Amino acid sequence: MFSFQINSNCSSTRARVGCLNTPHGDVHTPQFMPVGTLGTVKGVSPDQLLKTGSEMILANTYHLHLQPGEEIVHEAGGLHKFMGWDQPILTDSGGYQVFSLGKLNKIDDEGVEFKNPRDGSHLKLTPEIAIQIQMSLGSDIAMAFDQCPPYPATFNDVEEACLRTHNWLERSIAIHNKSDQALFGIIQGGCYPELREESARVVSSFNLPGIAIGGVSVGEPSDQINHIVRKVAPLLPEGIPRYLMGIGSLRELAIAVSNGIDLFDCVMPTRLGRHGTALVSGERWNLRNATFRNDHKPLDETCLCETCTNHTRAYLHHLIRSEELLGLTLLSVHNISHLIRFTRAMGRAIEDGCFSEDFAPWQKDSIAHYTW
């Protein structure tokens, strides 16, 4: 039902190409996952998403628990049927919301007490509840409940979050009993190498079908993220997928892949699209700028997505300036396609034996700009 095969390795880096088999289809790695927090990738329909080449998306346990509630989703036949997406889905456990909504919660060893931001009611999220919600949602991959510490944080605070995350992982494993759903553990440790290494050892000891590196992209410098990945990735089991949470820039993706990471997610492509920004050749173009008013070329002349095939920079500029919703959708479609295309190009380079020359280390003026 769930398996992972490594099909090709780079001879000079840790980069690899693999295939993750799930009940709803295969995921070819390295793979970028668009974020569909509430069961929708903002502004993009499932059909449009499929045409970008996306193979798996991420949804969020915490937000779906609040609205519409896992009972409604379960009654509909599970999250895939509820949202009309018949491809793999990974659900995050809600641990990141412990970090991002810190003023609204109280954390102890039992779990997290939330004040519902919608109606002010008091809610509790524990490892057991988080896993039960994910089993009801019916995702292909569930994430263990974890505590994501903020940045910066003291050594003692991060150590406490690590110990709690490891305890919550044990409890998540104990309650999880859905045979057609894989459970991944999450490594924490902030920017402290010794805590990261210890967390990697502990989480790896549970022999799970996949492991994520969490607690990144919470405000720390990009170089710190790359340092964490270099430290942690070699400690992880070889034969399972490795998932770096919350990463989406081309440089970070390439560095992570060179260190043996397989899966990624980030809200960046759709967030930028909703603000009128397009990703083109690793750069960010603000389509509001007057320079695009009379520019009748495709948005990205090297891209074959529906946006670039059918629409010009001038038209997109017009839509954004006119505050037409279609403009935000078209930019989001392109931005997702941009990241999917980049990860696929890295996979081809690994198979062709030229990844280290083309992508690692990825530089803004490197050949990577011209080969994918």
UniProtKB/Swiss-Prot annotation:
Active site: D92, D265
Cofactor(s) demanded: Zn(2+)
Enzyme Commission numbers on file: 2.4.2.29
Binding-site list for Zn(2+): C303, C305, C308, H334
Cofactor note: Binds 1 zinc ion per subunit.
Subunit-structure text: Homodimer. Within each dimer, one monomer is responsible for RNA recognition and catalysis, while the other monomer binds to the replacement base PreQ1.
Protein name: Queuine tRNA-ribosyltransferase
The organism of origin for this protein: Prochlorococcus marinus (strain MIT 9211)
Protein's gene: tgt
